């Protein structure tokens, strides 16, 4: 085996798996506290092609938990910062970025309750795997349903805010989740749409109540970059977060993607 930056990974996965990862295209929606760590792990595992979707710019308040957030990156688009990190890790990787929020508007279709205004920008059939790391229910539903319609594997992250125990994260089918308020909503929405199964990462920890109300100071003294979309001032609730919780969720997501794409689960008989 020739030594390269992925040699240690190859020792566990094998050359065949590394080739599969190098040829895979993973679309990650949401490059924040969860999605940023997912992309980081995928890049360090040898995934060769990325589609990154996020309209947000790095904010000072992201520094406590987001891998892309540093003093020098504040004000820059998250997808641009993430692309730079990927290419610094693996110059051979191909990275496509979309500086937009995968938003939705009402639609009369029987299959889709929501239709994104930018739907034509995304051809899900070209993706090897889809990662949903957004925090908006309508966008999550649309991402999942479009992946399902194209028979593309998809994994979705449930709530990671207002939690302190990273050991409570689990991988399960959406219908076997408990405790998570977001998962409860998604169970109902997936059942309504006839979705039989959906792999998710969720936490069994009961959501904690923030000790202080940040919304007041954030609404009057917003430190987001001028003109940034979806400022904190426009959010109804601002969840508390710590570095060691959303990061773990993101790494678990990446682990599932790697094991599914590489085929190592079957060869190693992993559960």
Predicted regions and their residues:
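Glycine-rich phosphate/adenylate-binding loop
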Residues: 2, 125-126, 139, 149, ...
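Conserved S-adenosyl-L-methionine
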Residues: 43-49, 149
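Glycine-rich phosphate-binding loop and adjoining beta1-alpha1-beta2 segment
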Residues: 47-90
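Hydrophobic/small residue at the entry helix of a nucleotide-binding pocket
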Residues: 34-35
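Conserved N-terminal Rossmann-fold NAD(P)-binding element of oxidoreductases
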Residues: 28-30, 53
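Ligand-binding beta-strand-loop-alpha-helix segment within the catalytic cores
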Residues: 74-107, 114-122
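N-terminal charged helix/coil linker that caps or initiates catalytic domains
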Residues: 1-27
């Amino acid at each position: 085996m020739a030594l390269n930056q992925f040699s240690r990974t190859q020792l566990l996965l094998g050359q065949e798996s590394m080739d599969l990862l190098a040829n895979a295209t993973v679309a990650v929606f949401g490059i924040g506290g969860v999605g940023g760590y997912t992309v980081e792990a995928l890049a360090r595992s040898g995934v060769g092609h990325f589609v990154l979707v996020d309209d947000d710019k790095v904010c000072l308040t992201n520094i406590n938990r987001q891998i892309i957030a540093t003093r020098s990156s504040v004000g820059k688009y998250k997808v641009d910062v993430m692309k730079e990190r990927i290419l610094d890790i693996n110059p051979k990787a191909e990275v496509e970025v979309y500086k937009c929020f995968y938003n939705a508007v009402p639609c009369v279709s029987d299959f889709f309750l929501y239709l994104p205004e930018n739907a034509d920008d995304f051809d899900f059939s070209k993706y090897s795997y889809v990662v949903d790391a957004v925090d908006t229910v309508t966008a999550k539903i649309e991402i999942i349903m479009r992946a399902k319609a194209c028979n593309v594997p998809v994994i979705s992250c449930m709530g990671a805010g207002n939690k302190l125990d990273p050991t409570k994260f689990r991988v399960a089918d959406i219908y076997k989740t408990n405790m998570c308020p977001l998962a409860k909503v998604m169970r109902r929405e997936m059942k309504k749409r006839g979705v039989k199964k959906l792999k998710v990462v969720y936490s069994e920890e009961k959501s904690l109540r923030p000790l202080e109300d940040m919304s007041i100071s954030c609404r009057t003294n917003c430190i987001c970059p001028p003109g940034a979309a979806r400022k904190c001032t426009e959010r109804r609730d601002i969840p508390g977060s710590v570095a060691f919780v959303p990061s773990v969720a993101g790494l678990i997501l990446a682990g599932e993607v790697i094991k599914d794409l590489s085929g190592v689960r079957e060869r190693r008989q992993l559960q």
